[in-house]
């Protein structure tokens, strides 16, 4: 009873904290009438897109839920819908906050002319998204655990279940897989839809506004300016929040699935009797342990967030954000050590599942995950921040022309793949050394255990960026834009760590889900056989090799589709901007207003049209290949997708980020003799335009592709293991 109360209490407190912060921000003044007008344009555009997107998503979600109920269990379908609702709720709440906080940040900067008060409003607004991600994710998972796991007895019955179609699975593993899939589907739609929206508007605004019309960033004469600012909220707040919520849930669920299948797999046949090598009590503790771990992390995140909100405003935003993030991380590390030891210390059979140092073993794996995430974040910052040589060199190469910018940007991205990959390799090996495959899953959870703070920091950046756009469009004092730009720059630096955690956790979780895929193939006839014979994928099997090739190819086709989706929408926007510049008298002189709504309609319509196909690729690839060629082929597909997708995600994120910051390096006055409007600047604007869909659409979506394909495969493997054409 007390445990159940604790389970509910922490997510509810987090959501209550988010509601309090929402109310506190909304009470702050919005500024001048012009500021209110611009803010209302951004807010209505974002709300309209999100409403249409949500309707489209839930039509698909209901169909998937019905299919899950038919082919697996009704509990899986219900859990899927719950995951979709929780993920969508976090995105809606976070974006509504962001579109209300932006103008209030600009007003705080305008009235005080200080960084501290503006930082406080921006971070308090961002914390609503962060707390919503942690709160809604864990509230849904706790409901699944308590209702289906405890009340309906799925955690007590860990034997293989055979449903009416003859499909074999462990019921609770199937149910939590449904919850994870619900979160993943929302993340895919939000990331793709938001990514197409924001980058199409961004590309069009840059291509015409900066290079043809010589208009500065966020100039009110540019018809795409409002759409660009709407896109920041749709893609960088709602999309990012759904992405990290899905990663967070995926890390927890992969741990639960692995633990659930340990009971039927670790069985020894002695004579005619089957003896479980790992007691049921141990398995049940390993199932609930990752949920407790995540709850502790959420509690620590609230303390880290509270530090910035209650403290006296500071003019050093980098220090404040770092203290918030590392306070959350340090508290999580310390408190989870106590949790791990006292929760697992009396359990038997831990050595059988790979715990090398007894009860404390998974905590070591979690620490490996945290340090791996920090290191991957450092590499992301090293290759993309203009404080370091790679991006400085890229910026200087613009003097030689656009071709050199593109070539050097690609070279930088390719070279940047190696250090984080080596970090991942070592992290996986050490996590596995401490606690086996379960430890690898816990390492992913360790990276994201303080996700509420990470998302708060990441969401603060787009809010500050929007505030800068509003100040520019309202022609406020240049000092206001200077303050918001400083806040945005700090957010971009800190967000590099967040991207490292997102990419790293995706790979760790994908490996755990792949192990879950192998575990999920077990049938009642396999019980008692050595695990090494049951969990076998023959790399010399032609089906496995062929599947790996197809899986690798899928990631490139998927990426190509996303880039073309962005560019098609951007081309329509470019035509519209040119039309308005040509046909609206006095527009470029500032004597007439552009038709902002027409640009919003174009980007919104195209984003909504393009977001469904990538999700169907992710869902149908394992299903179609599985029913055609069987479980071994799908195992190969997953290997190819993970390996190729991980490398491509790092490459696109870092090339795109470097092109963006190389442009900012010149704009900051670091290339003597060359400023805005010069030929090197135009070359860097083109490089930034090329990188836009790579870093903010392709890279993040690849992470989700990997996890959706893995979860769908885990759910369906027991079907196409026995039912396939060839």
From Swiss-Prot:
Catalysed reaction, written as an equation: Na(+)(in) + diphosphate + H2O = Na(+)(out) + 2 phosphate + H(+)
Site (Determinant of potassium dependence): 495
Subunit-level organization: Homodimer.
Domain comment in the entry: Has 16 transmembrane helices and a cytoplasmic domain that contains the active site. Pyrophosphate binding is thought to trigger a conformation change that allows Na(+) release. Has at least two binding sites for Na(+).
Similarity remark: Belongs to the H(+)-translocating pyrophosphatase (TC 3.A.10) family. K(+)-stimulated subfamily.
Residues at which Ca(2+) binds: 660, 688, 692
GO BP annotations listed: sodium ion transmembrane transport
Any GO MF annotation of the entry: magnesium ion binding
Activation and inhibition: Inhibited by GdCl3. Requires K(+) for maximal activity. K(+) greatly stimulates Na(+) binding. Thermostability depends on the binding of Mg(2+).
Thermal behaviour (record text): Optimum temperature is 70 degrees Celsius.
Location of this chain's protein in the cell: Cell inner membrane
Documented EC number(s): 7.2.3.1
Name of the protein this chain belongs to: K(+)-stimulated pyrophosphate-energized sodium pump
Membrane topology: Multi-pass membrane protein
Source species of the chain: Thermotoga maritima (strain ATCC 43589 / DSM 3109 / JCM 10099 / NBRC 100826 / MSB8)
Intervals, Periplasmic compartment: 1, 72-73, 154-168, 262-284, 344-358, 431-436, 521-541, 630, 723-726
Domain of life: Bacteria
Cofactor(s) required, per the database record: Mg(2+)
PANTHER family in the cross-refs: K(+)-INSENSITIVE PYROPHOSPHATE-ENERGIZED PROTON PUMP
């Amino acid at each position: 009873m007390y445990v159940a109360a604790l389970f509910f209490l922490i997510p509810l407190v987090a959501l209550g904290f988010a509601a309090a912060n929402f109310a506190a921000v909304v009470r702050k003044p919005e500024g001048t009438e012009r500021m209110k007008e611009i803010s209302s344009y951004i807010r209505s555009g974002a709300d309209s897109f999100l409403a249409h997107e949500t309707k489209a998503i839930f039509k698909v979600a209901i169909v998937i839920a019905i299919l899950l109920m038919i082919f697996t269990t009704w509990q899986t379908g219900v859990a899927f819908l719950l995951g979709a609702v929780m993920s969508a709720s976090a995105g809606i709440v976070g974006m509504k906050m962001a579109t209300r906080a932006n103008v209030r940040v600009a007003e705080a900067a305008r009235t005080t002319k200080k960084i501290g008060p503006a930082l406080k409003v921006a971070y308090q607004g961002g914390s609503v998204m962060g707390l919503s991600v942690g709160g809604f994710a864990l509230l849904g998972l706790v409901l699944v655990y308590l209702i289906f796991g405890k009340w309906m007895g799925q955690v007590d019955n860990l034997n293989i279940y055979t449903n009416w179609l003859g499909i074999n699975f462990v019921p609770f593993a199937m149910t939590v897989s449904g919850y994870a899939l619900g979160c993943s589907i929302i993340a895919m739609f939000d990331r793709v839809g938001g990514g197409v929206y924001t980058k199409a508007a961004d590309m069009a605004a840059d291509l015409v506004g900066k290079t043809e019309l010589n208009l500065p960033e966020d100039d009110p004469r540019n018809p795409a300016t409002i759409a660009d600012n709407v896109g920041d909220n749709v893609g960088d707040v709602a999309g990012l929040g759904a992405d990290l919520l899905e990663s967070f849930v995926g890390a927890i669920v992969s741990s639960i699935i692995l633990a659930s299948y340990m009971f039927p797999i670790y069985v020894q046949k002695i004579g005619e009797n089957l003896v479980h090598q790992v007691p049921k009590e141990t398995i049940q503790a390993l199932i609930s342990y990752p949920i407790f771990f995540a709850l502790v992390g959420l509690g620590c995140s609230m303390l880290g967030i509270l530090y910035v909100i209650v403290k006296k405003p500071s003019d050093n935003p980098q220090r404040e954000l770092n203290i918030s993030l590392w306070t959350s991380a340090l508290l999580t590390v310390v408190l989870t050590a106590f949790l791990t030891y006292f929760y697992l210390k009396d359990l038997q059979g831990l050595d059988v599942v790979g715990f090398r140092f007894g009860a404390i073993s998974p905590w070591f794996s979690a620490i490996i995950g945290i340090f791996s995430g920090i290191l991957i974040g450092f590499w992301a910052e090293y290759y993309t921040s203009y404080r370091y040589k790679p991006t400085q060199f890229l910026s200087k190469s613009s003097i030689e022309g656009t071709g050199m910018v593109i070539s050097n940007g690609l070279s930088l991205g390719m070279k940047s793949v190696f250090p984080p990959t080596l970090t991942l390799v070592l992290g996986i090996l050490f996590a596995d050394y401490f606690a086996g495959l379960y430890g690898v899953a816990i390492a992913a959870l360790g990276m994201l255990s303080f996700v509420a703070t990470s998302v708060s920091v990441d969401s603060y950046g787009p809010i500050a960026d929007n505030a800068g756009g509003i100040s520019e469009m309202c022609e406020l004092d240049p000092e206001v834009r200077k303050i918001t730009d400083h806040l945005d720059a700090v957010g971009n630096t800190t967000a590099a760590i967040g991207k490292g955690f997102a990419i790293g956790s995706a790979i760790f979780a994908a490996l755990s889900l792949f192990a879950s895929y192998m575990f999920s193939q077990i049938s009642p006839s396999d019980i008692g056989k050595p695990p090494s014979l049951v969990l076998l994928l023959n790399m010399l099997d032609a089906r496995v090799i062929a599947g790996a090739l197809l899986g690798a190819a899928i990631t490139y086709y998927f990426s190509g589709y996303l880039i073309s989706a962005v560019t098609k929408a951007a081309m329509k926007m470019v035509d519209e901007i040119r039309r308005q510049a040509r046909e609206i008298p006095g527009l470029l002189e500032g004597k007439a207003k552009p038709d902002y709504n027409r640009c919003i309609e174009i980007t919104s319509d195209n984003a909504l049209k393009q977001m469904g196909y990538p999700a169907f690729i992710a869902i149908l690839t394992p299903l179609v290949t599985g029913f055609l060629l069987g479980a071994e082929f799908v195992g190969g597909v997953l290997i190819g997708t993970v390996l190729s997708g991980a490398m491509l995600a790092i490459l696109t994120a870092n090339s795109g980020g470097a092109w963006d910051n190389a442009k900012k390096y010149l704009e900051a006055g670091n290339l003597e003799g060359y400023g805005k409007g010069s030929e090197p600047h135009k070359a860097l604007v083109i490089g930034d335009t090329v990188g836009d869909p790579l870093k903010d659409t392709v890279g993040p979506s690849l992470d989700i592709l990997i996890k959706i394909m893995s979860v769908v495969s885990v759910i369906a493997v027991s079907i196409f293991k026995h039912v396939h054409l060839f």
